[in-house]
Structures are given as structure tokens and as C-alpha cells.
Swiss-Prot record:
Belongs to the RNA methyltransferase TrmD family. GO terms for biological process: tRNA N1-guanine methylation. The keyword Cytoplasm applies. It comes from the Bacteria. Its main location: cytoplasm. This is tRNA (guanine-N(1)-)-methyltransferase. Coiled coil: none annotated. One of its GO terms (cellular component) is cytosol. It comes from Gloeothece citriformis (strain PCC 7424) (Cyanothece sp. (strain PCC 7424)). Specifically methylates guanosine-37 in various tRNAs. Its EC number is 2.1.1.228. GO terms for molecular function: tRNA (guanine(37)-N1)-methyltransferase activity.
Length: 231
């Protein structure tokens, strides 16, 4: 899968792309990441990419010309999505990550900055807007890296035991169950006996019940969705 990231700060991605599962996925050519700086496509000698908004207002906007030129310089694969990282976008979720990982061969991630981008970018270039939630960050690189990480780990061959992906939080609209490792007794806190019993049926029942109780308590929105989907 190919990722083209339109960013004013390519160095932001250097360390993450060399580390952990992302680095391994790139080494194995499961994914390819291309960093494109729109400043290289600016029209003036100062490589200016921002300007004041028409009608007045606080802050600066990213100009349309460098962004359009940066995206139009890319190789186009058949199944491509052009994503703008913006607080106005659809909140990111596990189903969205899975859709992006399965339905597309190329993701173009545009990192917003300042007060945002010229609306013509959104109207005539972008095919999807994504947000991390109801809050504002200083740059679009953090959301873009989140999407990159979330999608790549779902690609076949990235995670060693792909079965584990199906058991994670949100995959079935339930949060994950509590997990423990050795020692069985730490200070005065003991691992639940059922997990040490060797009774796999009892363990599965306990884990399912923990998922249900945890989701009801912590994420009533997910619990409502789960009850609707599961009768």
C-alpha cells in the first residue's frame, strides 16, 4: 500500500518510520511512504504557502496552489483516497481504519496547518476529511501519523499474529478484557484465579463478561451499538 503525505515538516516522520512495526512494514515493502513538501511547489521565490483569509479573521490559511500541485505531482493508483486531517472531519474509528486498509491502494494524507486550508482544497481535491476528535492540535502531522500507524498495522504481514487483531478493542464494538502476566502475586494484588486455572472455556467466559462490563461502564456509546447489533 502506498502513502503520500503532504507535509510542511517531513522530518516529523523520520523517527516513527524507522521504528517498531512501521519500520518493519516499510522494510518488508508491505507499505511505501512518500513525503511531499508543498513548499517545493510554491509559486514565489520565498516559497510561501500561506496567506491571510479573505474577509478578515485571525491567523493564516494554507494556499491552494502548492497543495494542488503537490497532489497532482503524484503517481495515481486505481483505488486512491485523498484525506485531509482537520478538526472538521469525521472522527477516526477502528472501522474507518479497516475500511482504509482494505478498500484503497493509495492514501494521500494532507496535513493541515495554521487556521486550516483554502476551502477549494476541501471542495475539489479532498475525498475524505478525518479528525482525531473534538480538540485542536498544532499541526496535521500528528493525526496523519495516527492514520498511517492504524492502517499499516492492519495490512497483512505487519502484525505477527493477525488473529490478535480480531480480538482487540473496538473490533466487535467491545473494549478489550483485562490482561495479566507474571508474577501471579504482585504486592497484595493477585491475578484472577480463573486465568490460572487452565480451563479455557471458563477463561473465555470470564473475558467476555469483562468486556461487557468494561464497555457498559466506560463507553456507553459502544455498549448501545453492541446491544443493537447483537440483539
Amino acid at each position: 500500500m502506498r502513502f503520500d503525505i503532504i507535509t510542511l515538516f517531513p522530518d516529523f516522520f523520520t523517527s516513527p518510520l524507522q521504528s517498531g512495526l512501521l519500520g518493519k512494514a516499510l522494510d518488508k515493502q508491505i507499505a511505501q511512504v512518500n513525503l511531499v513538501n508543498p513548499r517545493d511547489f510554491a509559486l514565489d521565490k520565498h516559497h510561501r504557502v500561506d496567506d491571510e483569509p479573505y474577509g478578515g479573521g485571525v491567523g493564516m490559511l494554507l494556499k491552494p496552489e502548492p497543495i494542488f500541485a503537490a497532489v497532482e505531482s503524484l503517481e495515481i493508483l486505481p483505488r486512491r483516497e485523498v484525506v485531509l486531517m482537520t478538526p472538521q472531519g469525521q472522527p477516526l474509528s477502528q472501522p474507518i481504519l479497516r475500511e482504509l486498509a482494505t478498500d484503497f491502494d493509495q492514501l494521500v494524507l494532507i496535513c493541515g496547518h495554521y487556521e486550516g486550508v483554502d476551502e477549494r482544497v476541501t471542495q475539489y481535491l479532498v475525498t475524505r476529511e478525518i479528525s482525531l476528535g473534538d480538540f485542536v492540535l498544532t499541526c496535521g502531522e500528528i493525526p496523519a501519523l495516527t492514520v498511517l500507524n492504524g492502517v499499516i498495522r492492519l495490512l497483512p504481514g505487519t502484525v505477527g499474529k493477525e488473529e490478535s487483531l480480531k480480538l482487540e478493542s473496538f473490533e466487535a464494538d467491545l473494549l478489550d478484557y483485562p490482561q495479566y502476566t507474571r508474577p501471579a502475586l504482585f504486592r497484595d494484588w493477585e491475578v484472577p484465579a480463573v486465568l490460572r486455572s487452565g480451563n479455557h472455556q471458563a477463561i473465555e467466559q470470564w473475558r467476555k463478561q469483562q468486556q461487557i462490563e468494561r464497555t457498559k461502564e466506560r463507553r456507553p456509546d459502544l455498549w448501545e451499538k453492541w446491544t443493537i447489533n447483537n440483539g
